[in-house]
Amino acid sequence: MEDFGFTTALRSESVYIVFRFISSSSLSYNTLSSAFIRLDWIKTPRHRAASRALGIQSNGQICTACPHLSALFGFLSVASCFPSNKDDGLHTRIYFDLEFQPDSAVF
């Protein structure tokens, strides 16, 4: 599947988010309704403020109950997330285990 992305506003901050799908075959709890994706978040000058708006804490952990995440991933249900973010100075990569909701999926 090809990458896809969209631009969203978080508290007046415009952020471009790119999704890339990764094989989930290595996950022991993988099911047909689950997929493992990588979210590449293109940094902006106010990246830290937008991170907080997304519920990404300073230690890299993600608050999955954050309403901004619910709004961003309205077509997906966040089953769990991995707090092992990698920051190379250009991108913050966040790993999610997502459960698809086919009735409302946009792709």
UniProtKB/Swiss-Prot annotation:
GO cellular component: mitochondrion
Cell location: Mitochondrion
Keyword Mitochondrion among UniProt keywords: yes
Keyword presence, Mitochondrion: yes
Protein name as annotated: Uncharacterized mitochondrial protein AtMg00720
Organism: Arabidopsis thaliana
Chief site of localization: mitochondrion
Taxonomic lineage: Eukaryota, Viridiplantae, Streptophyta, Embryophyta, Tracheophyta
Keywords attached to this entry: Mitochondrion
